[in-house]
Amino acid sequence: MKFHFLSSNNPEAKNTEKKLTELFGQNSVKDADYIIPIGGDGLLLKSLHNFNKLNKPFFGINFGSIGFLMNNLSNENLNDMITNAKKSTFKPLKMTAQSVNNEIFEAYAYNEVSLMRQTHLASKIKIKINEKVKMEELICDGVLLSTSAGSTAYNLSAHGSILPLDSKILALTPISAFRPRRWRGALLSEISKIDFEVLNNDERSSSVTADNVEFRDISKVNIVSSDENKCTVLFDSKHSIEDKILNEQFNF
């Protein structure tokens, strides 16, 4: 097996990268069989964006504050951990946004796409699902659409539903909804087409973010699940990601 190791700025992560490089050698990202990010979920997310075109599996090693999608490095041989690992396919969301000046932006998100107010005024957003209006006006700080992989990130902080990793469901979640106040969001099929329209965008300007890429002064957003830029992420078979997701739903 050939590995490409990369780490966050965490001193422990850097030290682990050094030790693993001494044990297994360091290969270029193009020559490696596996890409091994050492850090937190943020580093894994960054790696997926940077290297998705290479069609290499990712095996994250946890040295982050949360590391929900990462694996704990045990005394077991790394080769054995990867050989026995469970595979999961991460399909990104493809976001197409239009600015108030009619500029068009595209970006991909493995976690979520969020549309947020960028002034002191609440956003007013019309929501369409599969080209049918489902909400004429959501008054809120914002709204987000999350993948199953991203459902334990920003979506969870916004009180959205946690989704099983293989569920093929998207979570649509309001952020600090004012009207309708009791609306908690919706669970949508992965094949759904979602459209947001910012109402009164001349005075209630909004920005849209796809993972870590932001565009400002947005008037419309279209989101679909995409087969482009899919990634394979590996999980330690002895520490099930499914159990992590289940347990997270009972943490208070």
Residue ranges of each PLM-predicted region?
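Gly/Ser/Thr-rich active-site loops/lids in small-molecule metabolic enzymes
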Residues: 144-181
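ATP/NTP phosphate-donor binding region
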Residues: 1-34, 38, 44-53, 73-89, ...
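Short glycine-rich anion-binding loops that position phosphate/pyrophosphate groups of nucleotides
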Residues: 40-43, 64-66, 149-152
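Catalytic core of DAGKc-family lipid kinases
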Residues: 66-142
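ATP/nucleoside-binding phosphotransfer catalytic cores, i.e., glycine-rich phosphate-binding loops
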Residues: 107, 115, 120, 133-135, ...
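Short glycine-/acidic-enriched loop or helix-start segments at secondary-structure transitions
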Residues: 15, 46-48, 69-71, 155-157, ...
